[in-house]
Amino acid sequence: MAVYTDVAADELADFLKAYDIGELLSYKGIAEGVENSNYLLHTTAGSFFLTLYEKRVAVDDLPFFLGLMGHLATHGIVCPQPVKARNGEALGCLAGRPAAIIDFLEGVWPRKPNVTHCAAVGAALAKLHLAGRDFPMRRANALSVSSWRPLFEQATPCIDTVQHGLHDFLKAELDHLERHWPQNLPAGVIHADLFPDNVLFLGDRLSGLIDFYFACNDFFAYDVAICLNAWCFEPDHSFNVTKARALLGAYNRERALSEAEQAALPLLARGAALRFLLTRLVDFLNVPAGALVKPKDPLEYVRKLRFQQSVGNIREYGVAASGLVA
């Protein structure tokens, strides 16, 4: 979450008159993440999140995101729910931006994920994939393999200012992934951004999944690969096979990965690493002046990509291919 658009107190108070969520007591911007402007609201009725949608979030995609959260909640997935205004609409306009109020979930995201966290995330991700099977709306992944070259070209003039030789390294990897990307793996609704800061816990109990604004239709195993990169590396950039074993095993107990998915996982993990490397790189090079936002380090994903390039098969994630039992 982040703040790109400032909201005046009187403007916000007028906006909230359309909702039955009490009177505004206080609000503050949240300076985490890089995509939308987010505020935590405290009203006489409780706490809520206000999101103003900008950058990569297209207005036409918002019914998919908001509808998906409602659908998943009815299928047992704990996630935020949009608060509808008195006119029945979940989407409004504030400070010239599309805006929505989302209910507040208890919990904090884990700054130091442990094995128990990883297992909980694996199980929750599989349940999300199963719960989304009958969601009627569709959204293509706008940040899948076909989008990576335009991102690379956007960053090209400045890539080597971030790290010498990075341009040629990324070009070679992009060429490889475009040639070898899978075509026919099991697919459906995926979260596509299930990083630790998008998963809430109360102690070691998972209490909610948040930030569905990259959700789309794509390979289930690609979503798993994103989580391997996001959850299973240590601060010293080493890969923790114990965490990977916990995440993959818990996922597989809820939804079994096919042989084709297992075989493709190392390549998908390379793609997942490149996708986040490129978007971080573009964001790092294009932070608006004065924005209350902390761009994430693209070089973290250079290290993760180099590791994933070294992985030959799923066994190197600490599991056996047959039944995912080490």
Curated annotation (Swiss-Prot):
GO molecular function, one term: homoserine kinase activity
EC number: 2.7.1.39
Keyword list, A-Z: Amino-acid biosynthesis, ATP-binding, Kinase, Nucleotide-binding, Threonine biosynthesis, Transferase
Reaction catalysed by this enzyme: L-homoserine + ATP = O-phospho-L-homoserine + ADP + H(+)
Protein origin, superkingdom: Bacteria
GO BP: threonine biosynthetic process
Pathway entry: Amino-acid biosynthesis; L-threonine biosynthesis; L-threonine from L-aspartate: step 4/5
Name of a matching Pfam family: APH
InterPro entries documented for this protein: Aminoglycoside_PTrfase, Homoserine_kinase_II, Kinase-like_dom_sf, Pseudomonas-type_ThrB
Family according to the record: Belongs to the pseudomonas-type ThrB family.
HAMAP family, per database record: Homoser_kinase_2 (MF_00301)
UniProt cross-references to NCBIfam families, sorted A to Z: PRK05231.1, thrB_alt
Protein name, entry field: Homoserine kinase
Species this chain originates from: Nitrobacter hamburgensis (strain DSM 10229 / NCIMB 13809 / X14)
